[in-house]
Amino acid sequence: MIEFDNLTYLHGKPQGTGLLKANPEDFVVVEDLGFEPDGEGEHILVRILKNGCNTRFVADALAKFLKIHAREVSFAGQKDKHAVTEQWLCARVPGKEMPDLSAFQLEGCQVLEYARHKRKLRLGALKGNAFTLVLREVSNRDDVEQRLIDICVKGVPNYFGAQRFGIGGSNLQGALRWAQTNTPVRDRNKRSFWLSAARSALFNQIVAERLKKADVNQVVDGDALQLAGRGSWFVATTEELAELQRRVNDKELMITAALPGSGEWGTQREALAFEKAAVAAETELQALLVREKVEAARRAMLLYPQQLSWNWWDDVTVEIRFWLPAGSFATSVVRELINTTGDYAHIAE
């Protein structure tokens, strides 16, 4: 299995180095739910600005403040502890009056707003995230500048970031041990992390192999294509290749890669044969996903950062802003720009 740092680059390996997250303020994330609170209901949506706190810790503290069980506080996604992040938490408080959340005190946290809402905020129920990153000690400004220009046009590989696999790859290692021993895993969190790591690693492998062998944006017979921003897909046929290629070039359609699991993968003929060959050696992980009834799905192979802009503070420091849809990784953008020092794995999704 290819490690994250060794996955194939779309724009070639960066020529320069730099520092990501020299300070928490160098990594700012603003969550975009894509909807506004209802203004009524048994839940309260709370928008929190935090620095130096992980999401679960803040959620538990909020539950304690509201005198409710920790499971009654939910969130759409984990945000990094070592960053400045803005996100929504959701507390279920049926039959209770609206509390004064301005009295909620936690070091490194600030309540920005809160309102009633009708529904629980579930994991993954967000539109995306806006990022403001500062790269410091950049050793090759010209290379980074050109890469930013190229990314505006060609995007980046839509890899799952190293944080998906845990510190030191612990989640993927757990999945491999589970696959090899067939011992039941009772812990729901471990099950979720390990299965997610297994499927994500196989997806990354398929995309990396496609980048090695051919133009990742070249439609082949049997490819599974999806409308940009949509989840459903259809299969390309030989007769349609020219027209489908035009639509891919226009970014109207996206070529997808498999998220392996049980059931059909979604591709056919040439594309299916390629995907199967790309992960043929990973029989244990594939068998684990089938055994645990994780359904196969699809994910776009390329990611196009939206609203991408940048500003050089000086020759070695650049501020970069962009927006990514839910499930995408800022670190997959950064790895196409510079060779960073430090470990990506501690950066939450």
Curated annotation (Swiss-Prot):
Active site: 80 (nucleophile)
Keyword tRNA processing carried by entry: yes
Known catalytic reactions: uridine(13) in tRNA = pseudouridine(13) in tRNA
InterPro entries: PsdUridine_synth_cat_dom_sf (IPR020103), PsdUridine_synth_TruD (IPR001656), PsdUridine_synth_TruD_CS (IPR020119), PsdUridine_synth_TruD_insert (IPR011760), TruD_catalytic (IPR042214), TruD_insert_sf (IPR043165), TruD_pseudoU_synthase (IPR050170)
Molecular-function annotations in GO: RNA binding; tRNA pseudouridine(13) synthase activity
Cellular compartments per GO CC: cytosol
Residue span(s) of domain TRUD: 155-303
Key words of the record: Isomerase, tRNA processing
Positions contributing to substrate binding: 27, 129, 329
EC number, UniProt record: 5.4.99.27
Domain of life: Bacteria
Enzyme class per UniProt: isomerase
Gene Ontology biological-process entries: tRNA pseudouridine synthesis
Role: Responsible for synthesis of pseudouridine from uracil-13 in transfer RNAs.
Family the UniProt entry places it in: Belongs to the pseudouridine synthase TruD family.
Descriptive protein name: tRNA pseudouridine synthase D
Organism: Escherichia coli (strain SE11)
Gene: truD
